[in-house]
From Swiss-Prot:
The chain crosses the membrane at residues 239-259. The keyword Chaperone does not apply. Keywords: Cell membrane, Membrane, Metal-binding, Transmembrane, Transmembrane helix, Zinc, Zinc-finger. The keyword Metal-binding applies. A zinc finger (3CxxC-type) spans 88-197. GO terms for molecular function: olfactory receptor binding; zinc ion binding. Residues 1-238 are cytoplasmic. Interacts with olfactory receptors. This is Receptor-transporting protein 1. GO terms for cellular component: cell surface; plasma membrane. Specifically promotes functional cell surface expression of olfactory receptors, but not of other GPCRs. Residues 260-263 are extracellular.
Length: 263
């Protein structure tokens, strides 16, 4: 007796080739770096801003900017210098679940080298990723940074480059608003930089110095004001005032007791 199998029927007018059956595997991308990272950090915008500003800062030297997703923190070849931007602001877009979020804790790593004999230098750059806390996968969206944000970050890079490679002093770093602490908790378990041991959600040293200077100037007494005038205000916590308020309280209690006894 033959068994009827409808899936073996073939139409003489239309024959579709058989498809090989393969198992479906659900796998979440890990924090390992891949080549897609190079295309997601708007390489052309970074190079455009960097080349324009370096042409103004050092027109006699030739510099190149390379996106290197395999760059390691504190792992430097001889002659190379390092600069880390700890508090950049960027927008992440998850290509898996389409979740989008803004992060003020974006970490960018730079390695710099200058060949003085050839008058040529090279900068390698890596933008650390963050995992999506909705599904566990994320990549940096191409429209993650505005042009003015990139310009500020490049200014800081060039300031560090001139200090470390050229021995110049007197540069000023731009302290981004994102470097200030906010109410949002940074999730280190989803951050690629945190997983590699880069602590960056705390205020940077530049920010702490700025706040300490502001605090010192704002709290320092005025030099034109005499010393005896600084304590001439009304101090309601002094001993005479404490005795006065105690007397008033006892008087109120005495009046209340007298009123109750009369009733």
């Amino acid at each position: 007796m033959r068994i009827f199998r409808p899936w073996r029927l073939r139409c003489p007018a239309l024959h579709l080739p058989s498809l090989s059956v393969f198992p479906l595997r659900w796998k979440l991308p890990s924090l390992t770096t891949d080549k897609t990272m190079c295309k997601s950090v708007t390489t052309d915008e970074w190079k455009k801003v960097f080349y324009e500003k370096m042409e103004e800062a050092k027109p006699a030297d030739s510099w190149d900017l390379i996106i290197d997703p395999n760059l390691k923190h504190n792992v430097l070849s001889p002659g190379w210098k390092q600069y880390v931007e700890l508090h950049a602001s960027g927008r992440f877009h998850c290509s898996w679940c389409w979740h989008t979020w803004q992060s003020p804790h974006l970490v960018i790593l730079f390695h710099m080298f200058l060949d003085r004999a050839q008058r040529a230098g090279s900068v390698r750059m890596r933008v650390f990723k963050q995992l999506c806390y909705e599904c566990g996968s994320a990549r940096l969206d191409e429209s993650s940074m505005l042009e003015e944000n990139i310009e500020g970050l490049v200014d800081n890079l060039i300031t560090s480059l001139r200090e470390q490679c050229y021995g110049e002093r007197g540069g000023q770093y731009r302290i981004h608003v994102a470097s200030r602490q906010d109410n949002r908790r940074h999730r280190g378990e989803f951050c690629e930089a945190c997983q590699e041991g880069i602590v960056h959600w705390k205020p940077s040293e530049k920010l702490l110095e700025e706040e300490a200077t502001t605090y010192t100037f704002s709290r320092a007494p005025s030099p034109t004001k005499p010393q005896d005038e600084t304590g001439s205000g009304w101090n309601f916590c002094s001993i005479p005032w404490c005795l006065f308020w105690a007397t008033v309280l006892l008087l109120i209690i005495y009046l209340q007791l007298s009123f109750r006894s009369s009733v």
